[in-house]
UniProtKB/Swiss-Prot annotation:
It comes from Pseudomonas aeruginosa (strain ATCC 15692 / DSM 22644 / CIP 104116 / JCM 14847 / LMG 12228 / 1C / PRS 101 / PAO1). Its cofactor is pyridoxal 5'-phosphate. Substrate binds at residues 156, 322, 417. It comes from the Bacteria. Belongs to the class-III pyridoxal-phosphate-dependent aminotransferase family. Pathway: Amine and polyamine degradation; putrescine degradation; 4-aminobutanal from putrescine (transaminase route). This is Putrescine--pyruvate aminotransferase. The gene is spuC. Its EC number is 2.6.1.113.
């Protein structure tokens, strides 16, 4: 893959980016020195940059493009809706056909008893919404003191003020004095990195027990909810030990608090079930959703809400919350078509029965690499821990090993994401076995090149 810029348009676009664009999660000085990578088109599981390089996108954009790139049906759904009703708001007791039909379509695949949806423009907005909603719920029940939400360290729930607070990423907290009051955190179920001498099962129970300790510390009478991703995504694809979620369910059953399962990444097939909560057998009260809802073709998010919660909200008067683009008709039309594709083409069933088992089998083959301390994954998400010493799990003192590996990936025509020194993937659900083979071959090549630089 050519890493030299040969296209004059690339330089022009890079200059425009440098002079006018402030992209998210970016060191601007570093980017301006290097120049942005310009992505120009996509098809299936591949993207192309402005230099003509073909790249296997093993991150599905940003955990989003479940049905793959280039689905003309989604383009046509947006086109039809733009002609008929390009926009109308949902304020002032109005609705439109796409949004009510979409709410029903989501209810049809959601966990049992979750039949209502509040729509937003993103996953971050969805997590803002759950904070507002759970506090309004408890106030309506006559318990307004139940305001505290318990999250997990290294969890990710978006980057709005509420989202970054609910999440537990300390680097994000340091920019802006977060979390906001009323949000506290407990340990994450990260056995490889934090389990010490405990077995995975022992650590899973220990990590879950931290929830009960925090409830008792804060006082059950003050706790509104516990929020967690079924599998932590941006934190490094943290797959909890088998004992973790059963123990969490046991604790939640003892206390009068709500459970928020953040399904922004796991939702719409990523685990081989429609939702990660179904994969783990959990029964949340609220589920933030986004990303795979539209396969990233257009921004949209939402919160799926349990019927018992809605019954209380119905008694609470006006819910003073919403967004201009809540339930945007074009986004709703695209989401409806996206769900139709997932259902009619049985994409999630194929993930569960065929492609996910094959991906995880091939992924585990990378565990023998001298740079890999652990290979883990579920469904269509997976991670590799890059370590200096496999036996002792000793980390590299230079924190840039993951980013070095990521750069090798780009040069070799593969997108993997680096979370510190953990390499993660989340490919489109439509990836086929031959493309999985290509992914693994490229990943091993990139690991070899990284190891040559850091293990010499």
């Amino acid at each position: 893959m050519n890493s030299q810029i040969t296209n004059a348009k690339t330089r022009e676009w890079q200059a425009l980016s440098r002079d006018h664009h402030l992209p998210p999660f970016t060191d601007y000085k570093q980017l301006n020195e290097k120049g942005a990578r310009i992505i120009t088109k996509a098809e299936g599981v591949y993207i192309w940059d402005s230099e003509g390089n073909k790249i296997l996108d093993a991150m599905a954009g940003l955990w989003c493009v479940n049905v793959g790139y280039g689905r003309e049906e989604l383009v046509q759904a947006a086109t039809r809706q733009m002609r008929e009703l390009p926009f109308y708001n949902l304020f002032f007791q109005t609705a439109h056909p796409p949004v009510v039909e979409l709410a029903k379509a989501i209810a049809d695949v959601a966990p049992e008893g979750m039949n209502h949806v509040f729509f937003t423009g993103s996953g971050s907005e969805a997590n803002d919404t759950v904070l507002r909603m759970v506090r309004h719920y408890w106030a309506t029940k006559g318990q307004p003191q139940k305001k505290v939400v318990i999250g997990r360290w290294n969890g990710y729930h978006g980057s709005t003020v509420a989202g970054v607070s609910l999440g537990g990423m300390k680097a994000l907290h340091e920019q802006g004095d977060f979390p906001i009051p009323g949000i506290v955190h407990i340990a994450q179920p990260y056995w490889y990195g934090e389990g010490g001498d405990m077995s995975p099962d022992e650590f899973g129970v220990w990590a879950a027990e931290q929830l009960e300790k925090k409830i008792l510390e804060v006082g059950e009478e003050n706790v509104a909810a516990f929020i967690a991703e079924p599998i932590q995504g941006a934190g490094g694809v943290i797959v909890p030990p088998d004992t973790y979620w059963p123990k969490i369910r046991e604790i939640l059953a003892k206390y009068d608090i709500l459970f928020i399962a953040d399904e922004v990444i796991c939702g719409f097939g990523r685990t081989g079930e429609w939702f990660g909560s179904q994969y783990y057998g959990n029964a949340p009260d609220l589920m933030p959703i986004a990303k795979g809802l539209t396969s990233g073709y257009i921004p949209m998010g939402g919160v799926v809400v349990r019927d018992e919660i809605v019954e209380v909200l119905n008694q609470g008067g006006e819910f003073y919350h919403g967004f201009t683009y809540s339930g945007h008709p074009v986004a709703a039309a695209v989401a409806l078509e996206n769900i139709r594709i997932l259902r009619e083409e049985k994409i999630i069933e194929k993930v569960k029965a065929e492609t996910a088992p094959y991906l995880q089998k091939r992924w585990q083959e990378l565990a023998d690499h001298p740079l890999v301390g652990e290979a883990r994954g579920v469904g269509m998400v997976a991670a590799l821990e890059l370590v200096k010493n496999k036996k002792t799990r000793e980390r590299f003192t230079d924190k840039g090993v993951g980013m070095l590996c990521r750069e090798h990936c780009f040069r070799n025509g593969l997108i993997m994401r680096a979370v510190g020194d953990t390499m993660i993937i989340s490919p489109p659900l439509v990836i086929d076995p031959s493309q999985i083979d290509e992914l693994i071959t490229l990943a091993r090549k990139c690991l070899d090149q990284t190891a040559a630089a850091v293990l010499a």
